Curated annotation (Swiss-Prot):
Annotated keywords: ATP-binding, Cytoplasm, Disulfide bond, Metal-binding, Molybdenum cofactor biosynthesis, Multifunctional enzyme, Nucleotide-binding, Nucleotidyltransferase, Transferase, tRNA processing, Zinc
Organism (species): Mus musculus
Source organism superkingdom: Eukaryota
Cofactor note: Binds 1 zinc ion per subunit.
Listed name of the protein: Adenylyltransferase and sulfurtransferase MOCS3
Gene it is expressed from: Mocs3
Reported function: Plays a central role in 2-thiolation of mcm(5)S(2)U at tRNA wobble positions of cytosolic tRNA(Lys), tRNA(Glu) and tRNA(Gln). Also essential during biosynthesis of the molybdenum cofactor. Acts by mediating the C-terminal thiocarboxylation of sulfur carriers URM1 and MOCS2A. Its N-terminus first activates URM1 and MOCS2A as acyl-adenylates (-COAMP), then the persulfide sulfur on the catalytic cysteine is transferred to URM1 and MOCS2A to form thiocarboxylation (-COSH) of their C-terminus.
Length: 460
């Protein structure tokens, strides 16, 4: 049995340790709830991380499973601790990517995102929670990563990456991960990486599919080598329009994280000069070879003409955001606001409301008095759809006390497809009932209806 003085000493040591632990918990709680630090000047690259000579006891325990990998080992872990990675986009790709980089012990993470957390993000952007709705994505991600690994320095840049400061920022990091959601930013990040001499790990995801590759590394091509010219803006679909299953960007973000870790640890890259294609619905992974680096590439070629960053929105003809652009295809007389349509609806004036969204969106929500004919069927002049529209117009005319033709109001989600549908209806000759008929689209669509008229109507 231990002597009384030994028991007393142990009890005193336990008390001291408990007080120390309580103090550390109070400091941690204060740090997590403190106001964010002032943003560092964006034109000044962060100072390089100091090289590490050894791992601490806590680090050895924390990273013990990956330290056992002969390819990584202590040397690779020390390289990770001294590495700085810039993550452009803290959404469906950037969240899982940054999460695994922080967990693996990367020394510094720069997090660029101008957007704020929205409820519709939470199904796939796993660093953010319900309590963060309305907060900056960059700051929300940084706070979550600090909770995951307090040893990792997380620097938030809550603004859109732009040509006037992107190059200085990229020069302050060793590896860049492109997790953005728009074409202009992809070209901007690529050019900045080439001019700064940094490898770029890039991925994208939409619906059930995605792709991932490494640009400008180990003699491989850059983004411009593969895509010299941007696609026409009208051919680009984003997640807000096309949809995405959250696990798909999760898979691609994890693939990105693996490539970043290999490059940062000095293990090389598996996807420099090739691309991973993922089909989540079919469950297929496929690897394809990309074209080689182009000698005539305007940014990484033998005689480059792009020697500084440019206006990428002008170059691509689209904005550096994933927000849907509001089209202006019709004159004001061919459009009606949701407020005016609600007034018309309340008056009981006879009319036809034509919903031109795809069936999958109509299944989510609809106005009960609407007639559904998808825009795609109108565009291909589907005979059954035109008969359905003609029958609705004839029935409405017969039921109308005045016996006059009914006006048609066209609605969609945001007010873009409805304008296209009005153009189609104006050109139809196969439906006699449309001759000399008033056809207008409803500005802003059902999302404007939900925002301005009916707060209980679902938004998606």
């Amino acid at each position: 049995m231990a002597a009384p003085e030994d028991v007393a000493a142990l009890q005193a040591e336990i008390t001291r340790r408990e007080e120390e632990l309580a103090s550390l918990k109070r400091r941690l709680a204060a740090a997590l709830t403190a106001e964010p630090e002032p943003e560092r000047p964006l034109r000044v690259p962060p100072p390089p991380l100091a090289p590490r000579a050894a791992l601490s006891r806590d680090e050895i325990l924390r990273y013990s499973r990956q330290l056992l990998l002969p390819e990584l080992g202590v040397r690779g872990q020390l390289r990770l601790a001294a590495a700085a990675v810039l993550v452009v986009g803290c959404g469906g790709l950037g969240c899982p990517l940054a999460q695994y980089l922080a967990a693996a012990g990367v020394g510094r993470l720069g997090l660029v995102d101008h957007d704020v957390v929205e409820t519709s993000n939470l199904a796939r952007q796993v660093l953010h929670g319900e309590a963060q709705a309305g907060e900056s994505k960059a700051r929300s991600a940084a706070a979550a990563l600090r909770r995951l690994n307090s040893a990792v320095e997380c620097v938030a840049y809550p603004r859109a990456l732009a040509e006037d400061w992107a190059l200085d920022l990229v020069r302050g990091y060793d590896v860049v991960a492109d997790c953005c959601d728009n074409v202009p930013t992809r070209y901007l990040v690529n050019d900045a990486c080439v001019l700064a001499g940094r490898p770029l790990v890039s991925a994208s995801a939409l619906r059930f599919e995605g792709q991932m590759t490494v640009y400008h590394h180990d003699g491989g091509p850059c983004y411009r080598c593969v895509f010299p010219r941007p696609p026409p803006p009208e051919t680009v679909t984003n997640c807000a329009d096309g949809g995405v299953l959250g696990a798909v960007p999760g898979v691609l973000g994890c693939a990105q994280a693996l490539e970043v870790l290999k490059i940062a640890a000095g293990l090389g890259s598996s996807y420099s000069g090739s691309m991973l294609l993922f089909d989540g619905l079919g469950g297929h992974f496929r690897r394809i070879r990309l074209r080689r680096r182009r000698p005539d590439c305007v940014v990484c070629g033998q005689q480059p003409t792009v020697t500084r960053l440019q206006d990428y929105e002008a170059f691509c003809g689209s904005s550096a955001t994933d927000k849907c652009r509001a089209l202006k295809l019709l004159c004001p007389e061919e459009r009606i606001s949701v407020t005016d349509y609600k007034r018309l609806l309340d008056s009981g004036a006879p009319h036809v409301l034509l919903d031109v969204r795809p069936q999958v969106e109509v299944d989510i929500c609809r106005l009960p008095h609407s007639l559904h004919i998808p825009l795609s069927q109108l565009e291909r002049r589907d005979a059954d759809s035109l008969k359905l529209l003609g029958a609705a117009l004839r029935k409405g005319k017969q039921e109308s006390q005045e016996g006059v033709a009914l006006p048609v109001y066209v609605i969609c989600k945001l007010g873009n497809d409805s304008q296209k549908a009005v153009k189609v209806l104006q050109s139809l000759t196969a439906v006699p009932e449309l001759d000399s008929l008033t056809v207008q689209d409803i500005v802003g669509g059902l999302m404007a209806w939900a925002a301005k008229i009916d707060g209980t109507f679902p938004q998606y």
